[in-house]
Each structure stands twice: as C-alpha cells, then as structure tokens.
Amino acid sequence: MGSDFKTIPIIDISPLVAKIDDPKLAASNDVMEVVRQLDEACKEAGFFYVKGHGVPDSMIKEVREITRSFFALPTEEKLKIKMTPKTGYRGYQNVGENITKGKPDMHEAIDCYRPILPGQYGDLAKALEGNNLWPETPSNFKALMEDYLSLVKDLSRKIMRGIALALGAPVDAFEGDCAGDVFWVLRIIGYPVSTDIPESERTDIGCGAHTDYGLLTLVNQDDEIQALEVQNRSGEWVYAVPLPGTFVCNIGDMLKVWSNGIYEPTLHRVTNKTPFYRVSVAYFYESNFDACIEPVECCMQRTGGIAKYDNIVYGEHLVKKVQTNFVEGRY
C-alpha cells in the first residue's frame, strides 16, 4: 500500500499505445512521461485509470450491456452453465457462492479462464483443465467476449511494457519466461440491489477486501454506479469513481514479487449501496501459468540487494486461491 491518496490517478496512455512496438520507444519524451506516471501510480496507489487506450467505447459499453442481459435471465437459464469443480471452476455461480476471507460475496458471476488442454501443464493445472462455459443466450455472448478478450489482452501487454520501463527493466521483460505466454482470467460480475437478496442470506459486501493474484487487472465498470473502493495507507476507503471511457487498472501479487516490493497491490472491495443492479467485467492479465515468479535483479538492486519474497509458481498460487474461493458442499 502506497500513500494516503484521496483520489485515483488518471493516465492518458495514448503516447505509449501509439509507439508501443517502436524500437526507440524508451527514447520518446511523451512515452517516458506516461512511464513516469505509471511508476508514480503503482507506488502511491496501486490503482490508476487509463484513457487513450484505443479500445472502442462502443465495445466497452456493449460488453456491459450483454452482461446485464445475461444476469437478467431466469435462474434456471443461468444454471445451464453452472460452475463446479468438474467444469474446471468455469461457469456461472449464484449470489453468495463466491467466498472472500470466509464470507460470502453478494454477487453472481461467470468465471472464465484461458482454456487448458488435458495434461498441458501436468498435474499443476489439473483442477482448471477444460474450456469455458459460454451461455447460449444472448446468442452473440461468446463471440463478443472473445473479441473483447483479444483487445484487453493486447492493451494489457502495452501497459506492462510501460511498467517494465518504469522498473528499469527491458521493455519486453514481461514477454519471455515471465509472461510471454500469458494466462488470463475473466470475471463477468453482477451485483444485485441488496434488498433483492433474502435478508437471511444478505451481507453488505458485494466482494470482500482482497488483492488480485496476477500482474495487472483491467476493470470495465458501470458508468454511473459508485461501488468499487480502494484502501489507502491510513485505512480509509476511497471510491474508484466511474469515469466513462476509461478502464480502472490495478496491480497484483505477482508484480509485487517480481518487483521485490517496489510495487505493492492494494486492498479493494465492492459495496453496492445503490438501488441499481451493477455490472463489472474484470480482466486479469497473469504471468505464464507455469512461470516461477521471483524478484528480478534490477529490482533487487534498488531494494537492498536481497530478495524479500520467496519464489512463487503462479499456477500453484492461482489454483490454491480458486479452490478456497467457493462454498464447499454446493457442488
């Protein structure tokens, strides 16, 4: 956790996006100003908005609209793609089935992961093997989400190039053994109005306080519903106020280890206190599934010369988290 920030910084990354594959990227003053802002945001807040990202606003809105359409379907229709351990933890989960720190979260969701072939990572990924369960209704749901996935994956690569430069690493530091074959997670989430949940099952938390597991998260949230909160160093909760046309970005656990603590992920939660149903689509850009993440030399040199964290195999970290995130006995 960085500072006692009261607002979350907004970064126009258009210079970085425009020159992302230019061999002279790091020689551009405009690009290096974006890099400076990314560095400051990662240190001070662990969260930032990006604009000038190149993803069409029409696509961002359409993804939210189709998400809302799916969650408005009857429960029996949504349960056609019900998540279980047998589905590789992919599919639909009802309100209260996701658990954060032992407490049920007041949201429903479709969880998707990069498809994993049987035996692709040996026993490491056995729990998550399989393909995603896409709903048949709306009929264009799968096609739209796969187009969206392609765009946000590419955007994440661009932002991570900027973060690599901010840490004093080569621009492609996250494109080799660390994240050259990135794993990804997509959570398509709906937060009901609290009074629509039976009182006996209701809590006040849409998603409990947590940090994310991987390198970078991109959140596509409703334009007008204020619910995502980020905790500053003093323990105050600061709203990530919706800003149309932007993504809310935050860094995760793997980047903390890789940077040897130069960047630390920030606790965040969701509390939907409004009288409106809220949707959010979170894309998690992760390392290679079988990558062993460890502090890198350039970051250790800036932090005393000693590794502060043990090595972590990303896939082990993810599977352990996934298997503790759902209510036992409901499957």
PLM regions: where:
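Peripheral, non-catalytic segments flanking oxidoreductase cores
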Residues: M1-Y331
